[in-house]
Amino acid sequence: MPAWSLLVLSALPVVGMFAGQTTFFSSPWETLFGTAAEQHEAAMDGRIQGRGLLSSHFGWYGWPGQTFDYVIVGGGTAGLAMAHRLSEDGSNSVAVIEAGGFYEIEAGNATEVPMFLFNYFFDNGHVKNPLFDWYQYTEAQPGLAGRKMFYMQGKTLGGSTARGAMLYHRGSKGAYQLWADRVGDDSYTWDNWLPFFKKSVQFSGPLTNPRPANATASNDVSAFAATAEEEGPVQVAYPYLTNAISSWVDKALEKMGFPEAQGFSNGQLLGRSYITHTIHPKTRRRDTASTSYLQTALRTSNSLNVITHTLVKKIDFDEEKRATGVVVNTGGFEWQIGAKKEVILSAGVMRSPQLLMVSGLGPRETLEKLDIPVLSDLPGVGQNMQDTIILGPTNPVKVESHSQLMGSKETLPRSIYEYNNFRTGLLTNPGQDYFAFEKHQPGNLSEATAADIDKAFPADWPTFSYIALDDTFVPQYDGKNYFSMSAALLATFSRGTVTINTTNTADNPVVDPRWLDDPRDKEMAVAAFRRCREIVASETMQQVIDGPELLPGFEYQTDEEILNYIAETSDAYYAGVGTCAMGKPDDPLAVLDSKARVRGVKGLRVVDASAFPFAIDGQPMATVYALAEKVAADIIAGN
């Protein structure tokens, strides 16, 4: 985890709730909380102006007989996009049920200031906020030295868009062709996805000032909407600040033969480029499904109802196996919400399969062990979990990096002042603004593993992504400048599971990603680590490297030594997918059809990352937004 994140809480204020009012207390620092307070106040004003009363959009908890056309479980990435589109024309009543609340209030600046994301991103032993995260831990991972890994999962309006790294890019064209082939539906090819990608976001190009001339960001603007009528509410932009180390990595990769990519959103990933984020280009704050889709809906729709701090316990069905609503719990009070048309699960890769299983849809053996009546025997529920890890060496550098925020008495206060007063400085950048994607190279993998990758994945699918992480994996407290040339594995073979050992959805499910379980993944991890070292050792990078490798140190040379270091220090990618996978009718592990409908029942869909048939080649956020747009369009069209 980035080391500086343990310190930044000293810059955060304390929040108190008294008599229904939010009270803000300034810290000794130049407080940043005004950013959160101002945004929340503006959002409230907008809703009051648009709808007359704030409460007109929020649930009458426990009101008998509450029924809506569509009930959406989970107010996260997909759930809020679906809610906005289904309620947009006012003809459908829509309820969103969210276990959390507003992250701006419950977590403050750590969720809004781009560089503060790492406060709650990892389990650092010091910072815990169960108000907006499920605090899920995995089973012990043999491939990661037996560690039980913290797995970030947003429990808040906005979901993991309020928690994650804000990275926005799309998969390769080959990935979406594979999706279409896997589910038997050509509407999932790249050309058919593209309108929904465009419909979900607003793109802003890089600023020419203060961006340095040697930090040019290229982008294929045809991948984004050409007019305001075609675009959506999510802000996609480049961070205001460019990390100093990134221009050196760019120059090094160019000399190593990496072609220049066009921003990673046009279906072509192989190459190098600065990467876009979901950061508002004017306020320079995190933009989420809540600040985009939800706020738009609250301003414009009369038919959306948002029910917060409410946990869904199970799905109700009638005698014809049609979903008729959900049983929920709000503060210990259990009640029911009805659905006239459909229930849509958007609870995420862990909680969507959990809800299916406690409601009687899943592997028969699992359900019978817990005395759950089997409504539909679906052996694929909770199977096929796919995620990856991030790894790499750390080196001292001669340019300013975000690692200075830890241990320097000047850098953090200065950065807070710059952000608070001018929206400039280190805090405008999340610390990872430069990426590259590469296929495996001849000789860096065994012939057998290379052949397996070539057979399993499309020709334009990268094996590795490389990230210029402007910080350290392991905390350093000396205030010096470090950077980690990092890599993620994108063509993995390990598969994990999500299951349950209780019928209570207040209990976390049992999550076992099985990272590096497959020996081919271990081989790729070592190859990626060596490639990172090769980049750092290049003539260009050596001009800015300021001494010997800090971590793990050059005494780690053999494959076994490197693999042990990776097992002990690598972090989760937090991009799990596939636990309620789409598939063809003859696929025994398919949970959904290509319209995201759950097999064996009626009136129930799953629309979130769990619906992916496989992990795409990179970050899933852009594809989750587009999937929600796509399925919502299908529903509205009556398909």
Curated annotation (Swiss-Prot):
Annotated signal peptide: 1-19
Triggers of expression: The genes forming the sterigmatocystin biosynthesis cluster are co-regulated and induced on oatmeal porridge or the fungal isolates were grown either on oatmeal porridge or in YEC medium (0.2% yeast extract, 5.0% corn steep liquor).
InterPro entries assigned: FAD/NAD-bd_sf, GMC_OxRdtase, GMC_OxRdtase_N, GMC_OxRtase_C, PAS
Assembly: Homodimer.
Entry keyword annotation includes Cytoplasm: yes
GO annotations of cellular component type: cytosol
Designated gene of the protein: stcN
Keywords of this entry: Cytoplasm, FAD, Flavoprotein, Glycoprotein, Lyase, Signal
Similarity-based family: Belongs to the GMC oxidoreductase family.
Enzyme Commission number(s) of this protein: 4.2.1.143, 4.2.1.142
Pfam families in the record: GMC_oxred_C, GMC_oxred_N
Location of the protein in the cell: Cytoplasm, Cytosol
Cofactor names: FAD
Reaction(s) catalysed (UniProt annotation): (2S-3S)-versiconal hemiacetal = versicolorin B + H2O; (S)-5'-oxoaverantin + H(+) = (1'S,5'S)-averufin + H2O
Annotated FAD binding sites: T77, A78, E98, A99, G164, A165, M166, L167, A609, P620, M621
Source taxon at top rank: Eukaryota
GO MF annotation: an example: oxidoreductase activity, acting on CH-OH group of donors
GO term, biological process aspect, one: secondary metabolite biosynthetic process
Phylogenetic classification of the source organism: Eukaryota, Fungi, Dikarya, Ascomycota, Pezizomycotina
Ranges where the PAS domain occurs: 263-301
Glycan attachment points: N109, N214, N444, N501
Function as written in the Swiss-Prot or TrEMBL entry: Norsolorinic acid reductase; part of the gene cluster that mediates the biosynthesis of sterigmatocystin (ST), a polyketide-derived furanocoumarin which is part of the most toxic and carcinogenic compounds among the known mycotoxins. The first step in the biosynthesis of sterigmatocystin is the production of hexanoate by the fatty acid synthase (FAS) units stcJ and stcK. The polyketide backbone is assembled by the non-reducing polyketide synthase stcA by condensation of the starter hexanoyl-CoA and 7 malonyl-CoA extender units followed by cyclization and release of norsolorinic acid.
SUPFAM superfamilies the UniProt entry points to: FAD-linked reductases, C-terminal domain, FAD/NAD(P)-binding domain
Protein's name according to its UniProt entry: Versicolorin B synthase stcN
Pathway given in the UniProt record: Mycotoxin biosynthesis; sterigmatocystin biosynthesis
